[in-house]
Amino acid sequence: MDQNPILIQRHHHRQNFAQKAPPAPLFLIHDGGGTVFSYFLLESLGRTVYGISNPNFETESTWENGIASMAEYYVNLIKATYPSGHILLGGWSLGGLIAIQAAHILSNDPELKVVGIVMIDSTFPVEGQFNKARRLAFMAETSTSPDMKEKTRKCMDEARIQSREWKAPSWRSSATETLDNHSQTINVQIHDHVTPTCPPTVLIRALDDGSNNSRDLNETSPTETSNDSETQALGFDRYQNFNLRYVVNTPGDHFSIFNKENVKELSKKVKEACDKLVMKS
């Protein structure tokens, strides 16, 4: 983990009339175990992809302010790698929460713009409570050594506390007005010139949640039309002014979505999410 962020996929851009600039890179933040092994299993996403691992994985150090401290540190890593332009942020499980915090930090950055967030089966935590339905995920190599398992377990224990104690950042509200049958989103800036608006976000949700009423695999729902919003949005419907555009199902459960039989479909969903978010920016 010496290289951080580590290059996971390199996109060789060919300039053409339709797309002169290379696609915005995607920075994926580690899972609860602190590693980025799972992201190396993804098929091509059509853009450069970096993985950010937990630098405390090999040490006894902890993060003083949890997710907030992690996000601040990771933002510096991102800026050192990609100082200016448009980027996408994302992550599996805990990584999705850190991505939200990092996007908030970067919201007023004059050089770097977060055009979207891609969360992979992340759950919005209730402060002070541990979510039992979807636990924090991690993925280790199949040849995990006892030492590696112990380090991963340490990160997992910390991640549970960090998730439980996380105070989600505040976002400014946005309003949608319809002009000539075209929906346009405008920022509401009444009495608030400091709080930023949230970048558009896609939540990729594991289809198998352990119940018998799983939805159709190909269903893609704007969150405002979901009849079961809390389940469908994994609690993010409770997050005030959070700009969750779509919830997309992918096969598998929280722990098997990166398995061989599921990762092709997951890769497709992540790629489609990135492409949609960039188009809306």
Swiss-Prot record:
Residues 210-232 have a biased composition (Polar residues). Residues 207-233 are annotated as: Disordered. GO terms for biological process: biosynthetic process. Pathway: Mycotoxin biosynthesis. Pfam families: Thioesterase (PF00975). Pneumocandin B0 is the starting molecule for the first semisynthetic echinocandin antifungal drug, caspofungin acetate. Pneumocandin B0 is a minor fermentation product, and its industrial production was achieved by a combination of extensive mutation and medium optimization. Inactivation of three of gloP/GLP450-1, gloO/GLP450-2, and gloM/GLOXY1 generates 13 different pneumocandin analogs that lack one, two, three, or four hydroxyl groups on 4R,5R-dihydroxy-ornithine and 3S,4S-dihydroxy-homotyrosine of the parent hexapeptide. GO terms for molecular function: hydrolase activity. Disruption phenotype: Significantly decreases pneumocandin production. Keywords: Hydrolase. Belongs to the AMT4 thioesterase family. Probable thioesterase; part of the gene cluster that mediates the biosynthesis of pneumocandins, lipohexapeptides of the echinocandin family that prevent fungal cell wall formation by non-competitive inhibition of beta-1,3-glucan synthase. The 10,12-dimethylmyristoyl side chain is synthesized by the reducing polyketide synthase gloL/GLPKS4. The thioesterase gloN/GLHYD exclusively interacts with gloL/GLPKS4 to maintain turnover of the polyketide side chain. This is Probable thioesterase gloN. The gene is gloN.
